[in-house]
């Protein structure tokens, strides 16, 4: 459906810190989580609301708004997607978690699935797919394919940084999906890495650089 680039000053400031050479694992991990929180706020801004009557603190009846029965599952793509989990779950503590594992063949750049554990009623849920990077789009497309095969009807993608090639490829394959990101960067290099990007986000999150 669309690509949403979040230009909020806090998002851009934190992303700028993440791009810095020599950033520590601790700082990168914390910033990844924080930007994940801010992007999730944006991705959930259109959740439907309904009126509910409650008893307020002083015993009187009060009409308030609650999210209208929207069930959500957060879908981190292993392993780097785990770096965004804490930040996302701060806003959605009741969300169920589905996990997808794919790794990229460094020669063909094609995704290789190795793990899939989805909630049983995923067909009734909004799936929020999280991964720091949307590079070639292959891994994201394969993940969305898996979710749709399981019956998922509503999917949003949350990534810190995207390459224009990956955005175009993902939306061409799945035009009904919305993508939320802090930046669409310049391009992919010949190794399939985003330029300027963040480097290898998984290595930086887990300290395996």
UniProtKB/Swiss-Prot annotation:
Binding site for uracil: 194, 199-201
Residue ranges the record marks as coiled coil: none
Amino-acid positions noted as binding 5-phospho-alpha-D-ribose 1-diphosphate in the UniProt annotation, renumbered to this chain: 79, 104, 131-139, 200
Pathway given in the UniProt record: Pyrimidine metabolism; UMP biosynthesis via salvage pathway; UMP from uracil: step 1/1
Enzyme class per UniProt: transferase
The protein's required cofactors: Mg(2+)
Domain of life, source organism: Bacteria
Binding note for cofactor: Binds 1 Mg(2+) ion per subunit. The magnesium is bound as Mg-PRPP.
Keywords: Allosteric enzyme, Glycosyltransferase, GTP-binding, Magnesium, Nucleotide-binding, Transferase
Activity modulation comment: Allosterically activated by GTP.
Catalytic activity: UMP + diphosphate = 5-phospho-alpha-D-ribose 1-diphosphate + uracil
Entry EC no(s): 2.4.2.9
A GO biological-process term: uracil salvage
Molecular functions (GO terms): GTP binding; magnesium ion binding; uracil phosphoribosyltransferase activity
Entries under PANTHER family matching the protein: ADENINE PHOSPHORIBOSYLTRANSFERASE (PTHR32315), URACIL PHOSPHORIBOSYLTRANSFERASE, CHLOROPLASTIC (PTHR32315:SF4)
Stated role: Catalyzes the conversion of uracil and 5-phospho-alpha-D-ribose 1-diphosphate (PRPP) to UMP and diphosphate.
Family indicated by similarity: Belongs to the UPRTase family.
The name this protein goes by in its record: Uracil phosphoribosyltransferase
Source species: Pseudoalteromonas translucida (strain TAC 125)
Name of the gene this protein is made from: upp
């Amino acid at each position: 459906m669309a690509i949403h680039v979040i230009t909020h000053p806090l998002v851009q400031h934190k992303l700028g810190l993440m791009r810095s050479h020599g950033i520590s694992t601790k700082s990168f991990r914390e910033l990844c989580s924080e930007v994940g929180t801010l992007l999730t706020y944006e991705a959930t801004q259109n959740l439907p609301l309904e009126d509910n009557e409650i008893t307020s603190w002083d015993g009187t009846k009060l009409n308030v708004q609650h999210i209208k029965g929207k069930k959500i599952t957060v879908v981190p793509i292993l392993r780097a997607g785990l770096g965004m989990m804490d930040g996302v779950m701060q806003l959605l503590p009741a969300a169920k978690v589905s996990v997808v594992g794919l790794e990229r063949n460094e020669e063909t750049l094609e995704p290789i699935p190795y793990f899939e554990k989805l909630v049983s009623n995923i067909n009734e849920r909004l799936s929020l797919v999280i991964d720091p990077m949307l590079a070639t789009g292959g891994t994201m497309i394969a993940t969305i394919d898996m979710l749709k095969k399981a019956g998922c009807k509503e999917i949003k993608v949350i990534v810190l940084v995207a390459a224009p090639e990956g955005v175009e490829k993902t939306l061409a394959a799945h035009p009904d999906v919305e993508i939320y990101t802090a930046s669409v960067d310049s391009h992919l290099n010949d190794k399939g890495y985003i330029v300027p990007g963040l480097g290898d986000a998984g290595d930086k999150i887990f300290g395996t650089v």
